[in-house]
């Protein structure tokens, strides 16, 4: 480089050149704040038979060597909970699929398994279970995780798919979890889909299901108050996430996948899922919004990824109009902030009528039909953080700088592989809680921490 003699005599120019050289030398050594995992905790190996029989004596005769898992279906940290304690929940139990004559059959490794709420402590490198609450009906009998209705749910089979199991109207596929300051629980459930109210002992107080669903003979009260259109949910894709408002009067529920409306082909190709708002005092749905998924191949470039692999899981109520929503595939997970105040409330509209054509799920762009979807802002790309496991489902905020997440390991049994004795052959997938230090603090008000928003 040749410098002009006149300019090199300029003291300001010389100082600027020296500064540039100094900064260039520093760049390789500079570090920038990054989102990172600061602690990881793992659930120790515990046989299901040992775990459940301690709670419900004699309920499990053979667990087929399946270990307790899937407690990370959701993660709750209440405002008064110790920093190292969380509430978690299993799903319906270890299950899988086996093809018979070209058709998949839903298998249940341990049909007696009972969905359970657990209070845990992160200690050392382990998830320590402090308390376990099995979910039971009004009679005190376990609800189990078996499907409810013929032609509505999948038919249940035993581990080998050779024996048809009985349906159970009480059965629950529990997923989302919140806990009130009074100690009772609200749960998002996938079979109906339904909202479940459970007392502090695990007894079902009431189950809220879609209108028109022929669910009878349950061991607990049932209220048919949800929009009838929700009866078109894709099997195993019901209410995956649930959030609670700060005044504990409002629930927010996310539907894991678009409804199969009007049919399976349309639903599995759709990008339009739904968010439901439920008023606890009146026991009524008060609002409904459209959540639009990202384009699947842009979100997760995995060759096996299709629009049907896009899902919603955890959700946190930041304030009365803002939710933090976990959008994911099995491999990629991102947190988005969505604004309810800027979206169309479609409750009671033609989009809840099965006769409407085209359906909401069929719309390539809901805006062309006058529907404003929830505006999304990316908050955190979890999959960009080194060490993040697959299938993140639970999220909880400890403070504006710290996020806790949990994964669902599917009881390490989803491959449906078994040995000569009929025992599970797993891959060693584990259940974890991970603490994440956020590079950019979230602008939270104190009441938003731990999934709680400001009172209205």
Regions found by a protein language model. Give the residues of each.
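N-terminal secretory signal peptides that target proteins for export/translocation
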Residues: 1-14
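Short, aromatic- and cysteine-enriched interfacial helices/patches
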Residues: 3, 30-32
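Intrinsically disordered, low-complexity serine/threonine-rich segments
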Residues: 7, 22-25, 73, 456
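Bacterial N-terminal signal peptides
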Residues: 16-29
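Sequence/structural signature of beta-propeller domains
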Residues: 32-456
């Amino acid at each position: 480089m040749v410098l002009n003699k006149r300019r090199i005599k300029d003291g300001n120019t010389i100082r600027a050149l020296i500064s540039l050289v100094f900064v260039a030398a520093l760049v390789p050594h500079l570090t920038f704040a990054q989102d990172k995992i600061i602690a990881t905790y793992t659930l120790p190996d515990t046989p299901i038979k040992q775990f459940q029989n301690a709670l419900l004596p004699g309920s499990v005769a053979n667990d087929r060597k399946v270990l307790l898992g899937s407690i990370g279906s959701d993660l709750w940290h209440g405002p008064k909970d110790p920093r190292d304690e969380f509430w978690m929940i299993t799903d319906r139990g270890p299950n899988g699929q086996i093809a018979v004559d070209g058709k998949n059959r839903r298998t249940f490794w341990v049909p007696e398994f009972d969905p359970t709420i657990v209070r845990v402590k992160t200690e050392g490198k382990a998830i320590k279970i402090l308390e376990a609450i099995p979910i039971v009906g009004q009679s005190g009998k376990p609800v189990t995780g078996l499907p409810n209705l013929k032609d509505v749910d999948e038919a249940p089979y035993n581990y080998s798919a050779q024996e048809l199991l009985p349906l159970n109207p009480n059965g629950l596929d529990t997923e989302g979890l919140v806990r009130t300051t009074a100690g009772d629980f609200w749960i998002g459930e996938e079979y109906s889909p339904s909202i479940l109210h459970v007392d502090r002992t695990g007894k079902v107080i009431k189950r809220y299901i879609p209108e028109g669903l022929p669910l009878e003979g349950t061991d607990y009260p049932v209220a048919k108050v949800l929009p009838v259109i929700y009866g078109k949910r894709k099997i195993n894709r019901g209410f995956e996430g649930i959030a609670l408002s700060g005044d504990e009067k409002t629930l927010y529920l996310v539907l894991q996948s678009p409804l199969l409306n009007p049919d399976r082909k349309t639903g599995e190709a759709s990008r339009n899922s739904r968010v439901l708002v439920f008023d606890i005092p009146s026991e009524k749905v008060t609002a409904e919004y459209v959540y639009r998924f990202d384009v699947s191949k842009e979100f997760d470039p995995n060759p096996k990824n299709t629009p049907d692999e896009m899902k919603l899981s955890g959700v946190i109520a930041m304030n009365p109009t803002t939710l933090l929503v976990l959008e994911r595939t099995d491999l990629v997970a991102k947190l988005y902030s969505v604004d309810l105040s800027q979206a169309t409330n479609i409750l009671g509209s033609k989009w809840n009528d099965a006769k409407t054509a085209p359906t909401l799920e069929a719309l390539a762009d809901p805006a062309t039909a006058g529907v404003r979807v929830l505006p999304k802002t990316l908050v955190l790309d979890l999959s960009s953080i080194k060490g993040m496991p697959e299938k993140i489902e639970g999220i909880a905020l400890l403070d504006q700088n710290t996020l806790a997440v949990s994964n669902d390991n599917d009881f390490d049994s989803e491959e449906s592989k078994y040995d000569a004795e009929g025992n599970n052959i797993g891959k060693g997938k584990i259940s974890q809680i991970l603490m994440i230090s956020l590079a950019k603090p979230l602008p939270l008000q104190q009441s938003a921490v731990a999934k709680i928003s400001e009172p209205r």
